[in-house]
Curated annotation (Swiss-Prot):
Protein name as annotated: Conserved oligomeric Golgi complex subunit 1
UniProt keyword Oxidoreductase, yes or no: no
Keywords, in A-Z order: Golgi apparatus, Membrane, Protein transport, Transport
Residues annotated as signal peptide: none
Biological source species: Arabidopsis thaliana (Mouse-ear cress)
Membrane topology field: Peripheral membrane protein
Subcellular location: Golgi apparatus membrane
Annotated family: Belongs to the COG1 family.
Underlying gene: COG1
Length: 1068
């Protein structure tokens, strides 16, 4: 036997081994012989415990099996009783069925006996049975969604009830039977009728629910409508209203189910509800409009019923019920008149507009269209909605009806339904979506321009900006700061026409130009300008995407002024912030001398220049602000660029294989066709716009220009004050003004005199160069101009700067002369001549700021690289020049009149030559008012001049526009020996700088370089001349002079004449 306990299992091997040796006696004997008593007792106790465990296990096993056996017996007895009961029931059913089959079945039972009492009792019983069977019948109809059948059964039960009530009300009949006593045999009749009457509300409710169940066929909705019309006694107008209200509920359910978080989901909901509207209008036509001679489906359904004799089966002699039913049908037919087409159209139009208001109105407190956040998404949504409107598949349920009406297949079902039902040339898009989409586009424009205002924070940028480190910085350190700008401005963007397929890729020259702009503006200004441009570009892209529609024309008229006004308002707000910061800096400059904790002037100037660069960037190098404010016709370029990108991606797709013919429905061809169609719609609308710039653009340009000048005015005032202080200090420390001997840099001039038929020569010494501090004064001013942008600065800024400097010079010399008259030492004759030359030279160089200039405002174009200025100047003497003349007159009075008459023409000639030699060095000022253009330039004979002589070669006065073409292909190119000539040039320059004089030694050595340079200039300008008109020659000449002026920053004063010969006219 098995042992379940652990102890028994432990000694199992011992027991087995004992039993295997033989009988129990031998085992016991061997055990006593081999084992001690302690182990024998252990084995005994283990064996006894094992025996008890086995007994208990056997006892539990037998008890469980017995209980199972008893339960099984009880189950068997119960099963037997159930089987007997089932058998008895089956036998009873079988007998009943046999008894039913043996009885005669008739619609109206025929009684063998004509006993009136029995006939009346039988008739009443059959009618009561009809009422009793009615609930079950109606339930079955409702379960099968046969609502019209259920309504008919209810109405017939009502007629039977009316018949019974009539019997109950009469006291006797033909057979003198008390009918009331007979009805007393059916006490549940009243209760039964209450049950039947409750089905009226159920039929109506289930029918309404059926109408709210989408996705069913038209027959199901017709059945529900007719059931409601019968039960609730509605006329056709009310039925139409009920049908339209149920569809409105459909639309509300779809709208409320949309979360409004995803634009794609919103567009799909719009398409779904639009499909509901189209299908509903089509079904209204099929249900209520009579087309040709065929009756509408609703009337056909509600008025077509089987004969009344077949509706009251089981009731003997139902003549009165039939009469009641016929009267009911007559009344129904009198009510169910076919609606007039105009009434149906008005109801549908009213319903359609209400649905449209719900679609674009607020749903759960927000507009679903707000989920669409870009103009491109609006355009895509419109495309999908229009595709849904024109889809034939949406109205597939009405195609058979349309075919029966028109006699053939209909290609545009919605257009035909619109003609039949609405009776108006109604466009669903215009009626529902157009206004909402336009308003949403305006909201998108508003939000993006609001983001522009938030993204470009002028105040924070100005407060954080400073290129100067340290608490205090003096003016000399400011002048010695490293230069970061200037030379890049000789590069102009290359504006080439881009092909349609090539896209809008920028050329390397354009990229270089943009990098130069970024280097000049700095990262802060570039980021702010790019932020403005990016957002304006985004707005314009959205707008153009929205214009790719059939409604492009009306949208352009509405949105073009709107976006221009918004752009103007946003940029004006930005400029207002700039103006506010400039006012703050102006106030800070005034407080600088009074407050020890004031902002250092150098930092104030840097911040004002920072705003000046920002305004310059927005005025001249913003691409999309002038594009938006310009004529909408210019927006075509953006449209074509966007389409070219799409076409490029289309062309990069794999083509069809050669053995596969491209069909008209191929995706690639279809996409290409759609793009062309959309582009043509947008471009046609844009080209139809007026070709005029918004007046706000000119106003905005004037504002930016004025603010740019205002920003540089702080720089002009501060720099003029500091430079004039240096000039005054140098002027006061100039001891040469009291010298009686010729000063350094003077030239001897030979004056021929005729006396008594003989000529004598008189040598006079006159200054040929301005004073070093005057040249330094003008050089530092030019260098500062070069630092902040060079010749790209607005002309009016340079004029103001020149005028301010000339005013300061005038004041300095007036005060200086007044002080010298009252103190020692007095100014000598030589000093007077030097001052006269200095004043005349400074007045000529700065004369551009002392003129009245009428500047024609340039017309803004989309290409800022081709920005040209045309000026018609009318120059008149103003106050500064008059004051200079007064100082000059005061100085000449210190000279002997006869001597002054001798000196004057030669002194002014020296000044003219000095002006011409320094024209390149001071080109920023000279370009404002170029003087002495008819004066021949001469080389200086001053022994201290460090100008290297160069071989004189013939050169052209003007660009060779009409000169014979000199092809570079037929001309041998002259190679320039760079190494030898460069070395000789350096040696020559070194000799001059060391004081060695060499007038002619290098002329022959460098003659080859002159010839090569002449050939290069002729060859390189021929192509330029071939593409320039005569009117452009002067512009090019002025620009080249302005560009060459930059080289003056790296040349000494005396070397200015080296390059001036390339930009000034020589007299032959």
């Amino acid at each position: 036997m098995r042992m379940s306990s652990a102890s028994a299992g432990e000694y199992r091997p011992s027991a087995v081994s004992l039993s295997s040796n033989g009988g129990g006696q031998r085992d016991a004997e061997s055990l006593f012989r081999t084992k001690p008593m302690s182990e024998i007792r252990i084995v005994e106790s283990a064996t006894r415990k094992n025996i008890e465990d086995k007994k208990e296990e056997l006892r539990q096993l037998v008890g469980t099996r017995y209980r199972d056996l008893i339960d099984s017996a009880d189950s068997i007895v119960h099963m037997k009783s159930l089987c007997e009961s089932i058998s008895a029931n089956i036998s009873s059913i079988h007998g009943n069925i046999r008894s039913l089959s043996s009885s005669s079945v008739a619609e109206t039972p025929k009684l063998a006996s004509l006993n009136p009492v029995r006939v009346n009792v039988y008739g009443i019983a059959c009618r009561v049975k009809y009422l009793v069977d009615t609930p079950e019948n109606i339930w079955g109809c409702l379960d099968e969604s046969m609502f019209l059948e259920a309504a008919g059964r209810y109405m017939r039960a009502q007629h039977v009830q009316q018949r019974l009530i009539k019997l109950e009300g009469c006291g006797g009949g033909v057979a003198e039977v008390d009918q009331s006593k007979l009805l007393a045999n059916f006490p549940l009749l009243e209760h039964q009728w209450q049950i039947v009457e409750s089905f009226k509300a159920q039929i109506s409710q289930r029918s309404h629910e059926r109408l709210l169940d989408p996705g069913l066929g038209l027959g199901a909705y017709v059945d529900a409508l007719t059931a409601v019309a019968v039960v609730d006694e509605l006329d056709p107008e009310q039925v139409l209203e009920l049908f339209l209200d149920s569809r409105k509920t459909w639309i509300l359910q779809k709208l409320n189910a949309c979360t409004g978080e995803d634009a794609g989901e919103v567009v799909l909901v719009f398409c779904d509800v639009l499909s509901v509207i189209q299908v509903t209008v089509g079904q209204v036509g099929e249900l209520f409009l009579q087309a040709l001679t065929d009756m509408p489906l609703f009337y056909k359904t509600i008025l077509s019923t089987p004969p009344a004799s077949q509706l009251f089966g089981g009731i003997p002699n139902p003549e009165e019920e039939v009469e009641l039913w016929k009267s009911f049908r007559d009344k129904l037919e009198s009510v169910m008149l076919i609606l007039d087409k105009n009434d149906v159209s008005k109801s549908c139009l009213t319903w359609l507009r209400e649905c449209g208001g719900q679609i674009v109105g607020k749903v759960s407190g927000k507009h679903l269209i707000e989920a669409i956040v870009t103009g491109a998404e609006l355009g895509s949504a419109e495309k999908l909605i229009r595709e849904t409107m024109d889809s034939k598949d949406v109205l597939r349920g009405s195609l058979d009806w349309l075919k029966s009406v028109f006699g053939s297949e209909v290609e545009l079902p919605w257009n035909r339904i619109r003609e039949l039902v609405l009776g108006d040339d109604l466009n669903l898009w215009d009626e529902i979506f157009e206004k909402a989409f336009v308003e949403r586009m305006k909201s998108i424009i508003d939000s993006k321009f609001e983001n522009l205002t938030k993204a470009v924070n002028v105040a924070d940028s100005v407060h954080a900006y400073s290129e100067i480190t340290g608490e205090k910085i003096n003016f000399q350190a400011y002048l010695n700061r490293p230069s970061t700008g200037g030379g890049v401005w000789f590069i102009e963007p290359n504006s080439k026409k881009v092909g349609l397929i090539s896209g809008n890729k920028s050329s390397p020259e354009e990229s270089d130009f943009q990098s130069c702009l970024t280097a000049y503006f700095g990262p802060e200004v570039s980021q702010m300008r790019d932020a403005v441009d990016r957002r304006c570009h985004s707005v314009l892209e959205d707008l153009l995407s929205f214009f790719e529609s059939e409604k492009a024309g009306p949208r352009l008229k509405d949105l073009a002024p709107y976006v221009q006004n918004k752009c103007y308002d946003s940029v004006s707000a930005l400029l207002a912030d700039v103006d506010k910061e400039l006012e703050f800096l102006c106030a800070a400059v005034k407080k600088e001398n009074k407050d020890s904790e004031a902002i250092p002037p150098a930092i104030i100037i840097e911040k004002s220049l920072f705003m000046g660069r920002l305004l310059f960037a927005l005025l001249n190098h913003s691409k999309h602000v002038p594009l938006i404010l310009g004529s909408p016709r210019l927006w075509c370029r953006e449209t074509m660029t966007a389409v070219s990108d799409k076409l490029s991606s289309l062309l990069r797709q794999p083509r069809f294989s050669s053995n596969t013919p491209a069909t008209a429905d191929s995706p690639g061809k279809q996409l290409h066709t759609d793009l062309r169609k959309q582009t043509s719609l947008a471009v046609a609308a844009l080209l139809g716009a007026e070709e005029k710039t918004s007046p706000k653009f000119e106003e905005l340009n004037r504002t930016m220009r004025d603010l740019c000048i205002k920003a540089h005015t702080l720089w002009i005032k501060w720099l003029s004050d500091e430079l004039s202080a240096i000039l005054l200090r140098d002027l006061r420390s100039d001891d040469g003004l009291s010298a009686t001997t010729p000063l350094r840099g003077w030239e001897e001039t030979i004056v021929k005199q005729e006396q008594d038929e003989s000529q004598s020569e008189l040598k006079i010494s006159l200054p040929s160069l301005p004073s070093l501090y005057m040249i330094s004064f003008l050089c530092r001013a030019s260098e500062e101009i070069h630092r902040i942008g060079g010749h790209v600065l607005d002309r009016s800024i340079l004029q103001k700067f020149a005028s301010s400097l000339l005013e300061k010079i005038t004041i300095i010399y007036e005060d200086f002369l007044s002080a010298r008259e009252a103190s020692e030492p007095q100014i000598s004759e030589k000093g007077v001549l030097q001052i006269l030359l200095d004043l005349r030279f400074a007045a000529d160089v700065l004369s551009g700021g002392d003129t009245s200039t009428n500047v024609e405002t340039p017309k803004s174009t989309i290409n800022r690289s081709a920005y040209r200025r045309r000026q018609d100047q009318q120059k008149t003497k103003l106050v500064n020049r008059g004051r200079i003349d007064g100082v000059t007159s005061q100085l000449t009075q210190k000279l002997d009149p006869i001597d002054w008459l001798t000196y004057e023409p030669y002194l002014w000639e020296n000044e003219k030559q000095s002006y011409l030699r320094h024209a390149v060095l001071f080109g920023f000022f000279v370009q404002l008012n170029r003087m002495y253009t008819d004066t021949a330039q001469k080389l200086s004979i001053n022994i201290e001049s460090n100008i290297m002589p160069c071989s004189t070669v013939p050169r052209f006065k003007y660009l060779p526009i009409s000169a014979p073409a000199l092809s570079s292909r037929s001309t041998n190119k002259v190679s320039i020996p760079v190494t030898s000539n460069d070395a000789s040039a350096r040696n020559s320059w070194k000799a001059f700088t060391n004081g060695e004089q060499s007038q002619t030694s290098d002329l022959e050595e460098n003659s080859n370089f002159g010839v090569a340079f002449k050939s290069f200039m002729q060859e390189s300008t021929l192509k330029l001349g071939s593409i320039l008109t005569d009117g452009q020659v002067g512009i090019f000449k002025d620009r080249s002079a302005a560009a060459m002026s930059t080289f003056g920053d790296i040349l000494p004063a005396q070397a200015a004449g080296l390059l001036s010969s390339f930009t000034n006219t020589r007299s032959e």
